[in-house]
C-alpha cells in the first residue's frame, strides 16, 4: 500500500461489498528495525485485517529500504519464517521488487526464503506480488515460489511463440497467434470484428498465460524437462549464465 487515499476505512468498505475467499492484509510499507520488528509489523497488519473479514488473511511481508537503494533482501527468509510461525497462513506474500535488483538475485532470495521455511512441520506456500514475466515466473517457481500476480497480462502484448513481452500497441503483429488460441473464448474474441483491440489483446495474453503456466507446472515435475523448458524460454546462451548464477536452483 503506497497511496494515502487508500485508507483502512476504504479497504473495509471494499471487503464488505466484494465476495472473496481470501484477503491480502492491509499492509504497511517501509518497515524499520531488525528481523523481529519487521516480522512484528507484518503480523500486526495481518491481525488487524483479520478483524475486518471472516475469510483467511494473507500476510504481506515488506522489507526495510537500504540507504544505497533497494531492500534488505537478506532479511527475507528469517522474517518470512517468523510470520509463518506466528500466523500459519494459507499463503505468505512478498513483493517481487523487494527480493533484489536482478532476476538472479531475486531467485536466490526466493531460494533462501524456501530454505528458511523448512522444518515448520507443514508446507508454507509463498505468493510473489507483482510478478508476471514468464522468465521470472519460471525461475522463482524453481526456487520455491507457489503463486503469483502481476499486471503484465494487461500492459503488454505477448509473442506466444517466443514467450516475449512487447509494447501493447504491437499486438497486431501477433494476431495470427490469437486466431489459433486454445481457449474458445479467446479464439472467438479474435475473430469477432465487434470486439475491441484492447479486449482482443488481453484475451490473447490470458490464453498465452494459461498455456505457458500449464507447461511450467508440467516441467517442474522433472528436472530434465524443466531445464529444456527454461533453455527454450531464456535468450540464446543465457542458460549457461543462469546455471552459473543459481547453483542451488538449477
Where are the predicted features?
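Non-catalytic, usually N-terminal nucleic-acid engagement modules in DNA/RNA processing proteins
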Residues: 1-54
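Residue-level preference for long, well-ordered alpha-helices that form the structural scaffold
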Residues: 3, 34-38, 72, 102-109, ...
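Polar/charged alpha-helical tracts
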Residues: 9, 13, 37-40, 85, ...
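Surface-exposed alpha-helical segments enriched in charged/polar residues
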Residues: 12, 44-47, 81, 111-118, ...
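C-terminal extensions of enzymes
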Residues: 23-33, 184-250
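Extended aliphatic helical segments
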Residues: 35-38, 43, 57, 61, ...
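Generic detector of ordered, mature protein regions
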Residues: 36, 70, 102-107, 139-142, ...
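Glycine-rich phosphate/ribose-binding loops and adjacent secondary-structure elements
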Residues: 52-190
